[in-house]
Swiss-Prot record:
Arginine-containing cyclodipeptide synthase; part of the ank cluster that mediates the biosynthesis of NK13650 C, a highly modified cyclo-arginine-tyrosine dipeptide connected to homoserine, citrate and aspartate. Within the pathway, ankA acts as the scaffold-generating enzyme and is responsible for formation of the cyclo-Arg-Tyr diketopiperazine (cRY) from L-arginyl-tRNA(Arg) and L-tyrosyl-tRNA(Tyr). The ankA product cRY is desaturated by the cytochrome P450 monooxygenase ankB to yield a dehydro-cyclodipeptide intermediate. It comes from Aspergillus thermomutatus (Neosartorya pseudofischeri). It catalyses: L-tyrosyl-tRNA(Tyr) + L-arginyl-tRNA(Arg) = cyclo(L-arginyl-L-tyrosyl) + tRNA(Tyr) + tRNA(Arg) + H(+). This is Arginine-containing cyclodipeptide synthase ankA. It is an enzyme of class 6 (ligase).
Amino acid sequence: MEDRIPVADLQHSAGSLAAIAFHNIEHCTQKTSSAILGYYHLPHIGSEHSSSDNADEAAKYTKAFIKGRKVAVKVANLINQGKTIHPVPLRVTGSGLVGGPPCEGHARLIEGITWFEKTQFHHQSLRPEGNHSTASHYLHFSTPLAQIIPGAEGRTQPMDVVQDITLISGMCLWASRIIQSSMPRGQRLDVSRLLSSKITLYEVEYLARAVPVIADLAAALSANNPYGPTPLNIRLDIPSFHYYHSLEERLRDGCCTFPEALQWMHAVEKRHHQLSRVFCRLIDHELSRRWVGTPHRRKLDVQVSPLADLVFQLICDSLANSVLPDVDDILQIVQTEDTTWVRFYSLVPENEKVTDFRALSYLFYVYQVLRPALEQTHVNTTEGDEATSKLLISVDDAFERRIYSRSQKLLKKLRASLPASAAVPHLLEVYLCRRIFINSNETGSNLYLDDPSPEPFVLRLCQGLAPEGKQELVRAQDRHNTRPETIKLDAFDVVEGLYGSHIAEVLKDLFAEVGLGA
């Protein structure tokens, strides 16, 4: 049976209402006439990898496919414990999308050309849609090593060497446009822009896209060993103090007072807590759907941005005293409060040490990836014990790739410094394929940068959607009492068209619990 996985093309330009066109992802990315520039669907392994007449460009697509496909197969072998009899927890199909930003420039430099393998997760039951036992996603798997976990592949039970597993993800707050509008250059702060109770399309869509993948991975990792499972943790990184460096520029320019700056930071803190709660609650909800009927439900350790709250509070304390925060003072306090930060910071080369708040913000994203690897755990002390590993699995958008590339470099240094008895950490990167493209992916932009929220969206086209998808959009039309030719959609309507009514309704309820809505 064909999977009908929709994507949306968000057409938006200054001064006009944003228009949404829905397409079937496999139909609209045919190599001869792709509606999403730079992306092509490959229905099977032997397909051509690019329709480009440029030999260099075609070579990039071919290389991306070969490299991505190899890692995808290794991931399936690892998670399925070498089993091949269907149904297995994770199946890589050999079909997928290859692509990225359509032309050279900053976006392609960050993301490159990527192979997104059509990946299917099999579950005993997915409540409330109990008859849907397979979830499909387009995912890119990446590791700098020849093996995901050296020494594990080729074993009868490859996951036996894994001491614990940590799934790592995160998201931004609001969207870039809203944050920038709250601090217009050369003008006073406008904190009201951050105090709106409206959610952005970026926030809702990212959660609808990322959380099911996190839950599917958690369930797949548990499927082969339900009675004696490897410890499984989830770490979410949601920014708080990380936005301060932009505010600091306004303070130094005299565009805001210390009380105004403090109010702005408190608005960020409020959104941080709201998004953290929704993220955690949605993970819990999606896991409960996948683990229904299993011998026992696992209790996961879920943490959000450890240590970041201390930095946030130190910054706010300085602002409350009308003093510009000093990054060196804050670093000194953090060094005395957290041993994992001390171990992490010792891995950072001298020429990459923190000199300002912008650098601290970026380095903290890297720290959150490495933190599970730095935390003290049991090590093998008996002679002859086999070496064990910690498996870190990140789930994120490809435009955050530089965070994980930096993390891999520091992990390599960490592994070299560990005693022979220590659990060795390895990071598997999982990247989500976009489901909303901006202006047909003309410049390779992403939803966070170009989200027109809180403006509504006009439905322009819904070709290629499954009948139930079209029914969902008709229901949206009825809710908003709009004429067929001018159907206006809010963020939840767009998510409903992309991911279905169930997750859209759950998200609507969870956001309402924290005082946010469309």
